[in-house]
Amino acid sequence: MNTTGTELNGELVLGRPFVRISLLTLLAGAVAALAGALAAAQPKLILGAAVSAAVLVLAFRAPVTNLALLILLTAVVPFEILNRFSVGGGVDSPGLLFSDLFLLAGLVWAAFALASQPLDRRRYRSVFAMVVFLMIVVLEVLHGLRLGYGRSIVGQEGRVLLGLGTFLIAMPLVSHSRSRERLFAALALIAFALGAWGMVQWLGHFSFGLAGDVGVRSGVRLTSGGSGQLQGGAFAFPVAIIVCFAALTLGEIRSWVWRGLLVAALALNIASCLVTFERSFWLDTLAGLLFVLLFAAGRRRVKLLLILLGAGVFTVAALAIITPSTLTTAQQRLISISSYSSDTSVRYRVVESGFVYDRIRAHPLTGSGLGASIFWGQPWAQVPPKTRHYSHDGYFWLAWKVGVPAAALLIGLLVSALFTRSPATEDPLSRAVRRGAQGAIAGLLVATITFPSFSQLSIAPVIGLLLALALAPQLGRRRRSRPSVSALAAA
């Protein structure tokens, strides 16, 4: 295979030296001009410009590392910490986050990487669809600003939706064997860090953060003794569980080190997901696991069920020893599903969706723009009306903000990823991760009915990554018939 101009060894090879020199000259000139302007206007922004330049270099020299840091920062690191170290940000006014730098730098790299690689019909359609969606998001940002919506809200919602562009960054990386293996290794470490962070928050009784993405929120509805619900990482726990489970059971991993890491990550994320006490995330996890089981061979399906049962029993037993009241709370929370007719949260969501639906009907094609809000209250709970930018139904939220056509484009791309077949030459680990990514997408599609996945920075880049893992074929040649994950240790 001719690999000139493609991504190899985690680095972008542009081919001709003249092209590289010209590109670097243009980038250097642009950076110098920007630095001069910033020095004249606001000297403290020079540091931000220097960091931006360093991140851009990282994206071109080590794109796998750049992508891994983007996922780590958004899925694990709380937003309050990201915003504290942002450029021009504050408590109520988010600035330029480090995750923004990694995303933008990665998209610049992806533009060159995708342009220099052969695209089959499926990849071309998926890349084109994502580019069109991101362009619509940019237009909706301008739409919201033109209508006078709050810049902070417009910027935050735009940041989240642009995070789906991680798909474009990951697509070239997961298509080649070396970068794919390095990415798998990095994702295993991130999954472990995510689950460990969840348990640290729960056992350490971290207070509920202002951004709502860290700590333990006090109280558990419809239970008699629940002390709180884990919030930090809640959207990503099901994803980690499903993908780790698929890799462990279908990936034929020989290295005991990596198997041990994945087992630990699986157990920690199961425990963390359990103590969120969010029924939607439990159903999300079950839907994804069932998807993985559905496509497994007959004999292997029994093995998968036994492994899943063993992991669940071990995790539940450990939690019962550490926090005995957890199982009682989880049982009561699960039983409460049958009493949905008297559940005030169901009424809340139905009424809320009615207000959002009215806004969708008012602007079905163009959307109301990012930053749009609704004004309503809950008289049955004596909650006065107030302005809200949030909707629990993620599909309604997306159609409300960017319009029905753009929402249908993104959802269609997600659904199409569920039916992508593995190439005949695909190695077991890559096939397992692909199946896990498809299962995670299936679970997210279920959870989005009651939780707005598309409006959360903690999961949007992960969704883009899952799309790439599910859709991208392998372009690199296999070096061995049954790859071992021990080769990933070089990452």
Language model regions located:
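Interfacial loop-to-transmembrane-helix boundary motif in multi-pass membrane proteins
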Residues: N66-L69, L119-I136, G158, I169-M199
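Hydrophobic transmembrane alpha-helices and their immediate junctions
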Residues: K401-L445
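Alpha-helical transmembrane segments of multi-pass inner-membrane proteins
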Residues: N2-T4, P17-A33, S52, L134-H143, ...
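Long extracytoplasmic/lumenal interhelical loops at the membrane interface
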Residues: F208, S338-G354, D358-V402, R421-T425
